[in-house]
């Protein structure tokens, strides 16, 4: 019986610890108004689960902030969009995550909404 409990405990620990916040490859839609079309590019971003809790009794002295899987370090890469008009700026700069962690959502650099547009949204259609 103790062996079964130990196995269950191990698998629960593994599910919590090993499925955490980590780098993952994603495809995003890139668009520029001057070019009037979208292309898909591959980049690296953060995804996974972070330990969080929602207290039953709220303490106004200690605000309850939910932690999300977000970037700790990032770099920017620039590409040239093919097929843009010659007079337009055809360069596009996008973020690439290099390190992730569980932290507070920074609304200055991240879409913190419950249901954002998503990485594949394109206002021009593909």
From Swiss-Prot:
PROSITE patterns: GLYCO_HORMONE_BETA_1 (PS00261), GLYCO_HORMONE_BETA_2 (PS00689)
Cystine residue pairs: 21-69, 35-84, 38-122, 46-100, 50-102, 105-112
Lineage: superkingdom: Eukaryota
Alphabetized SMART domains for the sequence: GHB
Record InterPro entries: Cystine-knot_cytokine, Glyco_hormone_CN, Gonadotropin_bsu, Gonadotropin_bsu_CS
TM region positions: none
The keyword Glycoprotein belongs to this UniProt entry's keyword annotation: yes
Subcellular location, record wording: Secreted
GO MF entries: follicle-stimulating hormone activity
GO biological process: follicle-stimulating hormone signaling pathway; G protein-coupled receptor signaling pathway; regulation of signaling receptor activity
Residues of the signal peptide: 1-19
Keyword terms, alphabetized: Disulfide bond, Glycoprotein, Hormone, Secreted, Signal
Glycan-carrying positions: 25, 42
Family that this chain belongs to: Belongs to the glycoprotein hormones subunit beta family.
Known role: Together with the alpha chain CGA constitutes follitropin, the follicle-stimulating hormone, and provides its biological specificity to the hormone heterodimer. Binds FSHR, a G protein-coupled receptor, on target cells to activate downstream signaling pathways. Follitropin is involved in follicle development and spermatogenesis in reproductive organs.
Protein name stated in the entry: Follitropin subunit beta
Organism: Phodopus sungorus (Striped hairy-footed hamster)
UniProt lineage: Eukaryota, Metazoa, Chordata, Craniata, Vertebrata
Gene: FSHB
């Amino acid at each position: 019986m103790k062996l079964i409990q130990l196995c269950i405990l191990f698998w629960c620990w593994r599910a919590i610890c090993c499925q955490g916040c980590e780098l993952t490859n994603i495809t995003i839609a890139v668009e520029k108004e001057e070019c009037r079309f979208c292309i898909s590019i591959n980049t690296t971003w953060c995804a996974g689960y972070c330990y969080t809790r929602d207290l039953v009794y709220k303490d106004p002295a200690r605000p309850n902030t939910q932690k999300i899987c977000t970037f700790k370090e990032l770099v920017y890469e620039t590409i040239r969009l093919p097929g843009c008009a010659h007079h337009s700026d055809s360069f596009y700069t996008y973020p690439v995550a290099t390190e992730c962690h569980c932290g507070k959502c920074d609304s200055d650099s991240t879409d913190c909404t419950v249901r954002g547009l998503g990485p594949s949204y394109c206002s021009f259609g593909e």
